[in-house]
Design a protein with these regions (language model features):
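Auxiliary Fe-S-binding modules of radical SAM enzymes
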Residues: 2-81, 251-361
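Conserved Radical SAM active-site core
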Residues: 85-209, 213, 223
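Hydrophobic faces of well-ordered beta-strands that scaffold small-molecule active sites
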Residues: 114, 163, 191-193, 214-216, ...
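A cross-domain feature marking catalytic cores of carbohydrate-active enzymes
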Residues: 118, 167-169, 193-197, 218, ...
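Conserved non-cysteine loop/helix-boundary elements of the Radical SAM core domain that shape
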Residues: 133-146, 167-174, 225-249, 274-280, ...
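Alpha-helix-loop-beta-strand connector modules within alpha/beta enzyme cores
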Residues: 178-190, 241-249, 332-338
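Short, catalytically relevant binding-site loops at active-site mouths
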Residues: 197-201, 220-223, 232, 272-274
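Non-cysteine beta-strand/loop elements that form the S-adenosyl-L-methionine
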Residues: 208-225, 293-302
């Protein structure tokens, strides 16, 4: 009688093959090969030809002279005046530049994500978690040449894994100019575009070849919700167009073997109390129209801020709390509804603790 049955022999053969693989690679990798790339990664802006870089510079200045960077389409000459965002064309207003450890693990890694928090925004979210710098100009002004110097400091002194532009929708031309200047000076880490997804297609086109990782936050679905909570009734149309364009440029999120993201789209959705159904619609649209392999972060850290819960006057003149329906933390049941809908729609790559003891890719 044979020592092992044919079935057991096949199982043991597969096990031995896996052990051999692990011994050669010295780590357990839990990801499909399409999402793994070799290090070192060469950022997209380092691959631009001198001619393409010159075209980017020219287009950047043209956008500032007739601003159409976001769907508000102010069309103002920002060298002479300002539009909805209140930021001129000669500089950017920056609140903080520093290694940041509050991002997704695949972005912050060990040394942090080199975050540049811009002041100002093209939305007016009533629940804004950073309203103190987003709803007004609060920071210091930097010309593109000065911003470029800071990007290099994030790389050399901070040893950051990437440069992370936070709320940059209204300063895209200045960002492009700064990255191109820094590239000539030795910048070589990926660029993260951390956006509310209220971008114009012209803006995303200008960023093509500059940005490595798009980090959009798709906030709400219904026009009435966007009008009430974001003060931008056309938010959904703009977000759908811009997210699809981002994915067309860089594809699904890919990593080096150390678990650090290098290129692709990582989409966020902050679940708002009472609006989980809109999160469900967003997940269904993403799976059907963008990619089932899209990396998604369903976020649960909503907290009443900005105008939510502030005292106001009702229709009859009685004192009441503004936006009382979202004046509470989000419930985990609401978050779970969105996550389950995402899985049912076909999405499977999530930012959450790994079930297998490794890291989720």
């Amino acid at each position: 009688m044979p020592l092992f049955t044919p079935r057991l022999s096949r199982i043991l053969a597969r096990r031995n093959h896996r052990l051999t693989f692990l011994s050669h690679h010295h780590r357990r990798l839990h990801l499909a090969p399409p999402f793994l790339i070799d290090d070192p990664y060469i950022p997209r802006y380092q691959q631009l030809s001198s001619i393409d870089a010159a075209k980017k510079r020219s287009k950047a200045y043209a956008h500032l002279a007739n601003c159409n960077l976001c769907p508000r389409l102010c069309s103002v000459n920002r060298f002479e005046t300002t539009g909805h965002c209140l930021i001129p064309g000669q500089s950017v207003s920056v609140n903080t530049i520093a290694p940041h450890f509050g991002e997704e693990p695949c972005l912050q890694g060990v040394h942090g994500s080199g975050s540049v928090f811009f002041s100002g925004c093209n939305l007016r979210c009533v629940f804004c978690q950073n309203y103190d710098i987003a709803h007004k100009k609060a920071g210091f002004d930097l010309a593109p040449e000065e911003l470029a110097q800071w990007l290099l400091k994030l790389q050399t002194t901070g040893r950051c894994h990437n440069v992370n532009f936070v709320t940059p929708e209204h300063v895209v031309p200045q960002v492009v100019l700064a990255v191109l200047i820094a590239a000539d000076m030795g910048l070589r880490i990926p660029i993260v575009y951390n956006t509310s997804a209220f971008d114009s297609l012209e803006s995303i086109e200008l960023l093509d070849g500059i940005v490595d990782i798009y980090l959009p936050d798709f906030k709400v679905w219904e026009a009435r919700t966007a009008k009430r909570l974001l003060k931008a009734e056309n938010y959904r149309e703009a977000a759908c167009e811009s997210v699809a364009a981002m994915h067309a440029q860089v594809g699904d999120l890919i990593f080096t073997p150390d678990g650090i993201a290098k290129k692709g789209v990582l989409l966020r959705h902050l679940v708002i109390p009472g609006y989980a159904d809109e999160g469900v619609q967003i997940m269904q649209w993403l799976a059907k129209n963008v990619s089932e392999d899209l990396m998604v972060h369903v976020m649960e850290q909503y907290f009443p801020r900005a105008h939510v819960g502030k005292k106001g006057r009702g229709k009859e003149g009685k004192e009441e709390r503004r936006y009382a329906d979202i004046n509470r933390p989000v419930k985990m049941d609401e978050v779970d509804v969105v996550k389950e809908a995402a899985r049912e729609a076909g999405l499977w790559r999530f930012v959450e603790p790994a079930e297998h003891g490794g890291f989720n890719l």
